[in-house]
Amino acid sequence: AASDVYKRQVIFRGMSNWQTGEHFMRKYTEDEKFMKEAIKQAKKAEAIGDVPIGCVIVHDGKVIARGYNKRNKDKTVLAHAELLAMKKACKKLGDWRLEDCTMYITLEPCQMCAGAIVQARVTRVVIGSMNAKAGCGGSILNLLEMQEFNHQVQVERGVLQEECSEMLSAFFRKLREIQKEKKRKRKQMQEE
């Protein structure tokens, strides 16, 4: 119904070039499908004790690269999911430009990753969860769509937001519980 189309448009405000509800629905389903792939990558990060952030890059309707956060494992700030996926995509395409590619990220990119996305000329970015503390895709800054740059990225926000947000929240809840337990044990040892 028309009201359903309107509701989806409200959820994904800022979306342009949607001409019909049918077109919108087809695109939404495709975005959801690829965001699920990014979520699978995020779960790999969680399995190695890293913050669960995942990314996939799609070209011509096919996933050409995947990445997940390995910052803690690799002990480098450069091991963000987006950068790892971009490196693979560039190698696969044989070019540093990722034109005609869509990147699906479970968490809004930081300033480093947003800058790399713009520099690589990624056409479109689909974000799961926004990042109020470090997001540069619209939360704190919007580097992706800045008119001052020579390239702007089309951005869709909130695709599978609940699932992406809950995965991160659960990870940090668990981390806080572990830290509390360690603190409790240290205190107990000091008292003995």
Regions found by a protein language model. Name each.
Residues 1-6:
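Short, small-residue-biased leader/transition segments that mark boundaries at the very start
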Residues 19-48, 112-192:
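Zinc-dependent deaminase
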Residues 53-61:
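Short beta-strand scaffold segments in enzyme catalytic cores
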Residues 73-83:
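A short, polar/charged loop-to-alpha-helix boundary motif
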Residues 78-79, 87-120, 124:
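Helix-adjacent hinge/juxtasegments
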